[in-house]
Amino acid sequence: MSPSDAAPALDGSRAVRAWLFAVAGLIFVMVIVGGATRLTESGLSITQWQPVTGVIPPLSQADWAAEFARYRQIPQFSALNADMTLEGFKTIFYWEWSHRLLARVIGAAFILPALWFWRSGRFKGPLGRQIAVATGLLALEPIVGWWMVSSGLAERIEVAQERLALHLLIGAATFGALIYAAVGLGERPRESASAGFVAAAGALAALIFCQLGLGALVAGLRAGLIDNTWPLMEGRLIPGGVFGLAPWPRSIVDDATTAQFDHRFIAYAVVASTLALAIAARRRAPRSSLARRGAVLAALAILQTALGIVTLVMVVPIEFALAHQAVALLLFGMAVVNWRATAMERRTVTAR
């Protein structure tokens, strides 16, 4: 390939890379808006799934009255919001409507450029498979989202926590898949990253991903509203009743005390793992990009844990809860960057 041929190809990769990062950024915003929707108890305000016509909010007083009437028919209204006015309903409606509107924006921002890049032959080899995975996840997410919402429309006053966790994890997986693909289109320095570092980076990303799911279970079970002390729970390191349901794995999903206990101790494991990775990388190559990524990961993990503690002891103020969720996604994204970049650096050295 001549230099003149290489330049357009490189420019094309840069365009695809920028697009992938941009969509990942939109998903980041989407997750934060989703968190605000949950924290404001707004997620059940729209009781119908209308993928096309739902883009337009109620425009007349009659439309608003009809929408409010539908909300008044579900259990959440009588249990939590029996004194809600139409103006109050509009507030929670717009949170959920904004969340769904952003989902549609993300769909368009992904699908339309993807079709153009595909027709231009930009999705070759592993990148094509990565885009296919991201497409599947994006298509699945709204289906799971409605499945989650529907769980709170009949017998419950909130959505099922396991469906909430799945909804968040699919969003996080899509976010991670886009970042993984985007980092793979960049150039990496020639640094000696051992197979052990690659495996450790992948394991860390998986651990943080699991921690995101545990955080969603804490949110769905309202477990942040109990045991608002730190570092002990109920005055003990291991509180009574942990894993007390039968069979015991049910406690992970259905018991608030167990959910908070799990989330706390996996947080400690994440901090310890990031610190160990940062120290090992610095000892191996102090000035390497691996060492810098390790330092960023450790700093984010410590910040995230501190935000979690503050959120807990202050009994979940919305601003700290949203910051906690935002940094969690940043930490996961950085872990994916580190995993992909470390693997690429190892291949670069091996290929020399």
Question: Where is each model-derived feature located?
Answer:
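Polytopic transmembrane helical bundles with strong interfacial aromatic enrichment
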Residues: 1-352
